[in-house]
From Swiss-Prot:
Domain Asparaginase/glutaminase: 88-419
SMART domains: Asparaginase (SM00870)
Catalytic residues in the record: T98, T174, D175, K253
Coiled coil (residue ranges): none
Alphabetical keyword list: ATP-binding, Ligase, Nucleotide-binding, Protein biosynthesis
The name this protein goes by in its record: Glutamyl-tRNA(Gln) amidotransferase subunit D
GO-annotated biological processes: amino acid metabolic process; regulation of translational fidelity; translation
A Pfam family reported for this protein in Swiss-Prot or TrEMBL: Asparaginase
Top-tier EC class: ligase
């Protein structure tokens, strides 16, 4: 069976007696390459796809190369299309990214799998875990994510649970996944099952791709985990042994390209997923239990600014934000939660005009304490609210959500200081901080 091939490519491969898994050679005056014949997902009927010795897949147009059959390969085992699935249902909601995408090799473009059948074909192991359904909500780069898209994702998650899903997997690009995780955590509470955000650091055509393992472990997590909260599930180390489920309001992408880039900050992961053993190992008992009756409040005010203080930053930036109609500022201050003393009057004016101003730390690890030094105490007198160990991005999203619920400044302050879904960790331990080796 020559899956996906048609037209000129199908005609040529059929004439050679080639099948998926056979070793072919393509050549012309400039190049000679051999590789294993792979299924095609190309729209160009002249393209054949080979997996090269380096592990990468490449497409070749039969209009530009000659093709010969070098040896017959091992036939891939066919999986039944009509097998009895295990009880339980997991909904996969795709928003973009490479996690459930296929590569069109003639252009290099990546397109999402567009149906449940395509996702199962992409990662057939998920059939062994549970029955799934899939929805392509939209397909965007994660840097193009906006609060209005968070609303659509939240509504889709609520709809999935209303339709009987036991857990939901949200496929998402990795760059802004932690923002979306926080947005879902605040806007959908009392969850009846896990909401698992998952992405891929390496595209599916690369030999080191993490997409298959991440998706398999996320489906397993969505079905088996006892908690009812939003988590991010990604590789737990650089090898392929396990993934870690991080609480959605305590996680951050800490490396540009490593497969284990996502780390819990000031917190421990909730669970470890041993995907080969099909086992979910719960690491803590303080998780939010599954609940009945989802509470959906997906309203966000995006006139909120994340202000990173640096030496020389002028306080008139606060007045610019005030005159531009912003309703809140999250400050990413230095150390225990500081800016220069120049900002005291500017923040006082902002608070007087009804803006919420909250303080987080650039250090990420540890918590804000604005009572230690005079600068912090004076900033508090100006109306700046210390936000403990909340991550700057999480504080930003929470303030967007809080302002979407109420315009009363005191109520916003109450919401921001209330530990709703584990965004504050009241107890820190030594092993919350990564100690780098220098030997």
């Amino acid at each position: 069976m020559l899956e996906g091939y048609r037209g000129k490519a199908l005609e040529l491969l059929s004439s050679l007696g080639a099948e998926i898994g056979d070793v072919l050679q393509v050549y012309n005056d400039k190049v000679s390459v051999k590789g294993i014949l792979m299924p095609s997902y190309s729209r160009d009927d002249s393209v054949i796809v080979l997996k090269l010795d380096n592990g990468y897949n490449a497409g070749f147009s039969v209009n530009k190369v000659k093709v010969s059959l070098l040896e017959k390969g091992n036939r891939p085992q066919e999986r039944s299309e009509h097998r009895e699935l295990l009880p339980g249902k997991v909904k996969i909601i795709s928003t973009g990214g490479t996690i459930v995408s296929k590569v069109e090799y003639e252009t290099g473009a990546v397109r999402p799998a567009l149906s449940t059948e395509e996702i199962i074909r992409f990662v057939p192991e998920i059939q062994e875990i549970t029955s799934i359904s899939a929805e392509i909500l939209f397909s965007i780069l994660s840097e193009n994510m906006k609060p209005e898209f968070w609303v659509k994702i939240a509504e889709a998650v609520k709809r999935a649970f209303d339709e009987g899903s036991e857990g939901v997997v949200v496929a998402h690009g990795t760059d802004t996944m932690s923002y979306t995780a926080a947005a879902l955590a605040f806007s959908i509470q009392r969850l009846p099952g896990p909401v698992v955000l998952v992405g891929s650091q390496r595209s599916s055509d690369r030999p080191s791709s993490d997409s298959g393992i991440n998706l398999v472990s996320s489906v397993l997590l969505a079905k088996e985990a006892p908690f009812g909260e939003v988590v991010v599930n990604m590789h737990g180390e650089s090898s392929d042994t396990y993934t870690l489920a991080h609480r959605g309001v305590k996680v951050r992408k800490m490396h540009t390209s490593r497969r284990d880039a996502f780390q819990s900050i000031n917190d421990h992961p909730l669970a470890k997923v041993l995907w080969k053993e099909r086992t979910v190992k719960v690491l803590r008992n303080d998780y939010l239990r599954r609940s009945d009756g989802v509470e959906l409040n997906p309203k966000f005010e995006n006139r909120v600014f994340l202000l990173k203080f640096y030496p020389g930053l002028r306080p008139d930036i606060v007045d610019i934000l005030l005159s531009s109609g912003y309703r809140g500022i999250i400050v990413e201050g230095t150390g225990l939660g500081h800016t220069s003393s120049d900002f005291q009057e500017a923040f006082k004016r902002a608070v007087k005009e009804g803006l919420f101003v909250g303080m987080t730390s650039q250090c990420l690890f540890g918590r804000v304490n604005m009572n230690v030094y005079q600068t912090g105490r004076l900033l508090q007198q100006s109306g700046v609210v210390p936000l403990g160990d909340m991550l700057p991005e999480v504080a930003l999203v929470k303030l967007m959500w809080a302002l979407g619920q109420t315009s009363d400044l005191e109520e916003v302050k109450r919401i921001m200081l209330t530990n709703l879904v584990g965004e504050y960790n009241p107890r820190h331990s030594l092993d919350h901080f990564p100690r780098w080796k220098h030997e």
